[in-house]
Amino acid sequence: NKFNSKGEPLFFESILHFNFKLFKLLRTKNINLNQKDKDENNIIFKLMEYNYKNQIKDKKLYLNTIKSLVNSVVDINAKNKEGLTVLHIAVGEKCEYTLRLLLEMRADCLATDNKGRTIMHNCVWKNTSKYFNLIHHFNKEIINIPDNFGIRPINYAAFMGKKDLVIKMLDAGALVNNSIKKDSRILQFLEKFHSNIINITQNIEKGVDKNNLKLLANNMINEFNIKS
């Protein structure tokens, strides 16, 4: 369980360079596969980092290695120092094939980071709304979970002007009301986006979508103290 000069467990290098002979040798030393580096990343985090930095060319080998590690008791739901899981990272780095694998291996969709945000919040914040349907397919509850500031994903999407995503969320059963107490800091931050709520129905042609957006906006105007 020693570390190298980069603050990583010694076995990380063998996995990151797919040197499985060395890895098998190290395993005879009873290494802890869930050991983390100085930033509290386990080996799956590091593999993913190498991948999104284009340091891994063989994507099939990369995915099979993640699968083998998880099957060898590496914690797929481990968190780093920011409270992020590998699912959060996969969404943020726009890596769909990794995201699909992790979801298929039953990674915890409801895991939250240090700010209480799920991967559905990440879809909004990281501009990866294209993964909404995929995530919602695996978990229907996640759409309405608020973060530590009292904000649901649909609220952030509306404030950020992501109308298409908001409509998808409404069609999928997202709640149009949010009576949860809001943190004063987030209310102040969101003030700069108030106009997006007031104008949310602009350029929306479909009547049912327009009505649903109007209902959401009316609720949010009251809940977030929005002034026209």
Feature-to-residue mapping (PLM):
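Ankyrin-repeat and related helical/solenoid repeat scaffolds used for protein-protein interactions
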Residues: W125-S129, E141-V176
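Ankyrin repeat domain, specifically the short helix-to-loop turn at the C-terminus of the second helix
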Residues: K24-N32, K67-D75, R100-D108, N133-I142, ...
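Ankyrin-repeat-protein effector appendages
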Residues: D171-S228
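Conserved ankyrin/ankyrin-like repeat signature
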Residues: K21-L22, L61, T65, Y97-T98, ...
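Ankyrin repeat A-helix N-terminal signature
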Residues: E13-N19, K46-Y62, I89-C95, N122-T128, ...
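Fold-core signature of tandem repeat domains
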Residues: L10, L26, L33, I43, ...
